[in-house]
């Protein structure tokens, strides 16, 4: 299991060691199981550049507290709110973010309604010019995270909110090495399942 702050050179070397020398595929970069679709890099990066936050006119936070997880991002959201008076929604109450936001519910059924275009927030996303939906890591730990993430991506794509000029779906990583590890394909669901089930005799950290 690779660490949260491991640089890419070390990640690459460890992968080469395990795969080519030890002939072992039991390698993962996640300390806990989270949903990742690494078929495309856009599925696990923050697609909206920080500098483009101010162009947004609607933000939906899903399982994230940007004030604690990404302070620079949070300050940009605050700046955009003050400048554009944009609407901000959160799937749950995450406390004081230094700007007002509307709490939908902590129940994932509400997010399912948004995905199915059966919620008022669905209409707001569709009518927005540059909406942003930010998935945090806690949302990606849910048993239903795969359905929710892929469903949201499908909803945004069908309504032209994911296109060559704007990708409304972003993933906020908590750790410095996460994206690099995913780029190197250091992911294996069977491995992390076996680690969590204590099936290995030796775990190399």
Regions found by a protein language model. Give the residues of each.
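Catalytic alpha/large subunits of respiratory electron-transfer oxidoreductases
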Residues: 1-205
């Amino acid at each position: 299991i690779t660490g949260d702050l491991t640089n890419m050179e070390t990640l690459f070397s460890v992968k080469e060691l395990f795969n080519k020398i030890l002939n072992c595929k039991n390698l993962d970069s996640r300390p806990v199981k989270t949903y990742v679709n690494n078929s495309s890099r856009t599925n696990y990066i923050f697609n909206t550049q920080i500098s483009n936050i101010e162009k947004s006119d609607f933000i939906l936070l899903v399982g994230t507290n940007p004030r604690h997880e990404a302070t620079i991002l949070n300050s940009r959201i605050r700046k955009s709110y003050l400048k554009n008076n944009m609407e901000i929604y959160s799937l749950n109450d995450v406390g004081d973010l230094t700007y007002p936001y509307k709490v939908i519910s902590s129940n994932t059924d509400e997010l399912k309604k948004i995905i199915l275009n059966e919620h008022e927030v669905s209409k707001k996303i569709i009518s927005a010019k540059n909406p942003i939906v930010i998935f945090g890591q806690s949302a990606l730990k849910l048993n239903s995270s795969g359905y929710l993430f892929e469903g949201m991506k499908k909803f945004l794509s069908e309504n032209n909110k994911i296109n060559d000029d704007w990708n409304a779906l972003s993933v906020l990583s908590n750790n410095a090495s996460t994206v690099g590890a995913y780029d190197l394909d250091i992911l294996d669901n069977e491995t992390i399942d076996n680690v969590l089930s204590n099936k290995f005799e030796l775990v190399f950290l």
